[in-house]
Amino acid sequence: MHRLTPWQDWSKYVDAALGADPDADPGARATPMPTLPAPRGPGKGASVAARKEFNRQLSDQMTELSQWWLRRMVTAQQPIHEKLTLLWHNHFATSAQKVRFAAYMAAQNQKLRSLSLGDFHTLAYAMLTDAAMMHWLDAQTNTAKAPNENLAREFMELFTLGHGNGYTEDDVRQGARALTGWVIRPTGQTMVVPKRHDRTAKTIFGVTGNFDASGFCDTGWPSRNRRNTSPDGCGSSWRPIPNRRRRRSTALSPRTAATATCGR
C-alpha cells in the first residue's frame, strides 16, 4: 500500500479492501479455523497420568490454534482483515497461558475478525462478555456477595479510557458490581446467573441506575470516551496497518479524524 502515493489511488484501495468479505478471501477459504472441542477434564481424584494427558491436550490445541492463525495471516490474499484482527487482539490482550482452553481463544479470535470494522462500542461489549476475557480476568468469581474488580478496572484502564483518564476508584467498584453474576458454561458460552448478580442501584460516572454489563458499557464508557479520545490516538492504531515504516500522517488525517470518537 505504501507504493500507492496519490490520495485517490490509495483511497480506492482502502475502500475496496475494507469492503471485502474476509470469509470470501481465497486464502481464508483454504485455511478454515480448526475445530477445537474442550477436552474432558480429569475430574477429582484423577491420576497424575490423567492430569498430564489433559494438560497435554490443552497445550496441543493451543499450539494448533496459533499455527493456524499464522497460516491464515500468511495465506490471506487481502491481509487487511487479519491485520485488523491482530490489532484488536493486541488491544484486548488476553493470556492464552492462563485461559488454556483453545476453544475460548478461537471464539474470541473470530469475534475480533467479524467485528473489526464495526463500531468500537459493539466490539467492547463483545469483549466484556467474552469467555476468554472473562476467564483471563476472573470474572466468574465476581458475585454480588464478593465483587471482583479485575474486569471493570481493566476495561476502563486498558481497553477504553486509559490509565487514570476520567474514572475514579469508586467508578471501578460500582462497575464491578454491574458486572457480577457472569459465568462460562461448559460449551464456552457466557451467561448471567441472576442470583449471583447485584440487582441494587449503582452510580457510575455520576449516573445512578440498576446497571448490568450492558448498562455499564453504555453508561460507564461511551460518552466519556468520545470526549477523551483524540484523532492522533485513532491514528496511532491505524498507522501500523498499511506499513511498518513510519509515514507522514497528513494523508491519513481526514480518515483518522473522522473516527476520532471511536464510538457509536
Q: Which residues make up each language-model segment?
A:
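N-terminal accessory alpha/beta regions
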Residues: 1-115
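Active-site substrate-binding loop specific to GH73 endo-beta-N-acetylglucosaminidase modules
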Residues: 18, 45-51, 65, 101-264
